[in-house]
Every structure is written in C-alpha cells, then in structure tokens.
C-alpha cells in the first residue's frame, strides 16, 4: 500500500514538474573556433535569456518555453553581433545558415517559426521586385493578413511590435 502511494506521488510530481522546453540546435558557417553565443530578448537585447559555447559554428540551447517569445541570437566575436530572430517555442528547432547572411538563416521545427518564416519569405519576395512605396504597402498588407490569421498568438503580437517600430523581421 505504501509503495503504491509513493509511486502515485512520484508520478504526480513528475507530471507537474514537466515544463515546455525549446531546444535550438544551430550550425552557422563562418564561426570558426570556439566562443560564446547569447540568446537575448528580441525587443531588449540587454536581457540575456541564456548563453552557450559554440565550436566551429555548432551550438545547442535548451531553454524554458512556457510561453513563446521572440528572441535573438547574438555573438560578440562577430562584426555584426546580431544573428537571427525567432520564437523560443516548445519543440526542437534547427537553425542553419551562414554568419555572412545570418538574418536569413533557416529556422524550422515549430509551427510558429514556420509561420514567421512564411511571412518573411513573402515580404522578401515582394521586396525584391517592387518599388519602395509598393514594398511598404505590400508589407503592411502581409502584416494585416497574418495578424488576422493569427489573432492573439505570439506571432501576431510580435508582428504588431515590429510594425510599430518600423522593423523588418530580420532587423
């Protein structure tokens, strides 16, 4: 009887202590040697969420993902330390690319990041083929479409913040 109660108690404790986790497995070419890479709040880069060592561009983060938030990776050893923005959403993310065009790195693995990638891809395509006025108008149309389609989730909240600050998602 005591052992059954103990097993039940341990099971409940284990279930309650499970937290959503975001694992980021990165591989960025152009980061030779070893150093530190930092995960910071995308809207206030003075807030460091986590840090990890990289070796020849390979790194791994494991952070709490109770609520998806937009984060940015930075690396002080690079001429432009800002690398890429994405959501620390529960699941395993793969981040690959080159530090020369790190803002265009590929982040995949969760529906929220895939949705962000889709918005950015559409904006980039339109940006490449349009005048400045048309670009701004189409970007706002895309923001509005995504806001309407993602009402109330982390993607829409961060798109609003980007538009208020006049930012492209890669900036």
Summary of predicted features, one role per range:
Residues 167-171:
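Charged, long alpha-helical assembly modules
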Residues 10, 49, 138, 151-152:
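Generic detector of ordered secondary-structure context
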Residues 1-28:
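Bacterial Sec-dependent N-terminal signal peptides
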Residues 120-124, 151-166:
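Amphipathic alpha-helical repeat scaffolds of TPR domains
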Residues 18-146:
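A non-transmembrane, solvent-exposed segment enriched in polar/low-complexity residues
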